[in-house]
Amino acid sequence: MFNAEEKLMIQELLARCAYAYDERDLDMLASCFSADAEMTMCIAGGDVVGPFKGRDQLREMFENAMSGQQDVRRHVISNIFFSELEGASVVYSNLTLLATENGNTKLITAGIYADHVEFSQSECVIKKRHLDLDSGY
């Protein structure tokens, strides 16, 4: 399980990842993931999308998603907690996705992230991420 310092680093990582997406900073966003990271997602209980493997493929997936989004996105990460699953430490957090367009802000979707993170030297990155969304985005 994670110690207090590691938990703080993980919370910073999740905030940085959300901020990078919202600011469309693909370099910062990609740096939140390990070189061999993997991500999957499931929308409204449908089929699993992915896996997207490796930092480059993740960056491309994020860039493609951003290209179709003309609104201003805000990823709000909350209810972060730490658990053990099959011998691995997992970080769970809630996503609330808001969007503003033409001065109107609305809820787009909500979901839950399940992240496996790794530490190297003084850095913390996402190694594996799964996102369960309540509805499309």
Predicted segments, located by residue:
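Short, low-complexity N-terminal intrinsically disordered segments enriched in polar/charged residues
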Residues: 1-23, 27-35
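Generic alpha-helical structural signal
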Residues: 11, 15, 56-59, 92, ...
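A beta-strand edge to alpha-helix "cap/lid" segment located at domain peripheries
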Residues: 67-137
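Charge-dense, low-complexity intrinsically disordered segments
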Residues: 4, 49-52, 104
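Short acidic-hydrophobic sequence patches enriched in Asp/Glu that either
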Residues: 9, 50-54, 109
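A solvent-exposed, acidic/Ser-Thr-rich amphipathic alpha-helical stretch
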Residues: 28-94
